[in-house]
């Protein structure tokens, strides 16, 4: 009986490997050809400055990298624990391969791209980056043990962030444990897992949190209009490569604290991840309704830094300052903020017990809640501190607000 079981296992493993090889065959050939072109360009001295979601414009991103020995308040890895964390989380990480239409001088043709996803429910909901699945004609998902789902569907995308949820028909997947990104600190050790370069599934890298609250502009390189401003990002020196987009950034407890999103090709060891807490509200909405909506309050703010505080003569050096511009009013009409009585020049310092600045931006902290939830804002107005309860609504594209 044991002999038959081993033979059956070997046969099944061989079939799985064959399926995986066939699945990535076209992608490998395409990337091999593309790699040759890139090497040829380098030999003649061409330096590419194209910004993409894996190529960040450094001029728009103030970066300060901490030394690898920096102290953090969270638990760090011990010898062997990186492998333990990787073994714990890898079953919850999937590879994503998309088929897209490519327009050229010769007409329309098909292309392939690859990314990574995080399983967030046993019945097949998967979290990834929006840019991984945008414009895809077909989405295929491969689990860490080689199971292939030929057609995944897009459930929803975040209108304000590079986040998407997709769904496969499953009933017994292993969901990842999600941590609290509000408590991470610079110097804390982390692990990244992903489908590196679209060819090396379940690649493991490690590093530290180099900084938090980073802002940057990213694009998939297809057009100027594809550029997207990303705020409140986690900076890490854990290696993040093309194909890692949508994969998890993990703490020493084996909890997902970020979604790996971007890196830069013109500097080493600089990658960025979206804080996981900022997508928990949409996740709750997805799991409860099967649709997924982003919560918002409808107020236009600027994050307060010491420089902003000086420029606007503000009494605090952190928080969210409600301001107007020539194009937009400070409070969206009929929004939750308007109904709650928020005003221009208010300074929001807390969302419930979370402090804006130390624990994240206003937008990021609101992202932890779903439409219909009520949050308590701590507000500084004309030198007086008050609390205002706001019942969140679902974001609408016409609202023109990031919060």
Residue spans for each PLM region:
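PDZ domains, with a preference for the canonical peptide-binding region formed by the helix
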Residues: 132-134, 271, 350-378
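A short glycine-leucine-enriched loop at secondary-structure breakpoints
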Residues: 181, 248, 312-315, 330-347, ...
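Flexible, small-residue-rich helix->loop connector segments that border functional cores
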Residues: 85-86, 345-348, 377
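Intrinsically disordered, low-complexity Ser/Thr- and acidic-rich flexible linkers and loops
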Residues: 105-107, 326-335
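Conserved PDZ fold ligand-binding element
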Residues: 126-127, 334-360
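Serine-dependent protease modules
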Residues: 3-5, 29-36, 40-311, 316-318, ...
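Surface-exposed loop/turn motifs at beta-strand-loop junctions within extracellular Ig-like
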Residues: 381-383
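N-terminal targeting leaders characterized by basic, low-complexity, disordered sequences
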Residues: 1-23
């Amino acid at each position: 009986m044991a002999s038959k079981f081993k033979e059956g296992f070997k046969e099944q493993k061989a079939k799985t490997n064959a399926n995986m090889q066939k699945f990535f065959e076209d992608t490998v050939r395409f990337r091999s050809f593309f790699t040759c072109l890139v090497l040829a360009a380098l030999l003649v001295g061409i330096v590419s400055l194209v910004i993409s979601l894996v190529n960040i414009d450094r001029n728009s991103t103030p970066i300060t990298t901490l030394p690898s020995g920096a102290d953090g308040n969270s638990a760090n890895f011990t010898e062997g624990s990186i492998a333990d964390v990787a073994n714990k989380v890898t079953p919850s990480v999937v590879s994503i391969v998309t088929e897209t239409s490519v327009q050229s001088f010769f007409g329309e043709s098909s292309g392939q791209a690859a990314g990574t996803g995080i399983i967030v429910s046993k019945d097949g909901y998967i979290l990834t980056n929006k840019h991984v699945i945008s414009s895809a004609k077909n989405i295929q998902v491969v689990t860490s043990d080689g199971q292939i789902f030929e057609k995944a569907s897009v459930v929803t995308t975040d209108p304000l962030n590079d986040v998407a949820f997709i769904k496969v028909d499953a009933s017994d997947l292993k969901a990842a444990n999600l941590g609290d990104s509000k408590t991470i600190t610079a110097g804390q050790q982390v692990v990244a897992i992903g489908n590196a370069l679209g060819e090396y599934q379940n690649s493991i890298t490690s590093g530290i949190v180099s900084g938090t609250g980073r802002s940057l502009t990213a694009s998939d390189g297809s057009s100027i209009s594809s550029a997207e401003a990303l705020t409140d990002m986690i900076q890490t020196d854990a290696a993040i490569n093309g194909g890692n987009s949508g994969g998890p950034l993990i703490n020493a407890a084996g909890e997902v604290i970020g979604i790996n999103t971007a890196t830069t090709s013109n500097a080493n060891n600089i990658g960025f991840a979206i804080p996981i807490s900022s997508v928990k509200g949409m996740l709750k909405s997805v799991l409860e309704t099967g649709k997924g909506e982003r919560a918002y309050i409808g107020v236009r703010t600027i994050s307060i830094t010491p420089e902003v505080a000086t420029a606007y003569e503000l009494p605090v050096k952190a928080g969210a300052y409600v301001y107007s511009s020539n194009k937009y009013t400070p409070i969206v009409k009929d929004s939750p903020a308007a109904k709650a009585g928020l005003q221009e020049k208010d300074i929001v310092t807390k969302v419930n017990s979370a402090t804006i600045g130390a624990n994240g931006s206003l937008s990021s902290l609101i992202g932890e809640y779903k439409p219909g939830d009520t949050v308590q804002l701590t507000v500084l107005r004309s030198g007086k501190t008050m609390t205002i309860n706001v019942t969140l609504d679902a974001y609408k594209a016409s609202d023109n607000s990031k919060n």
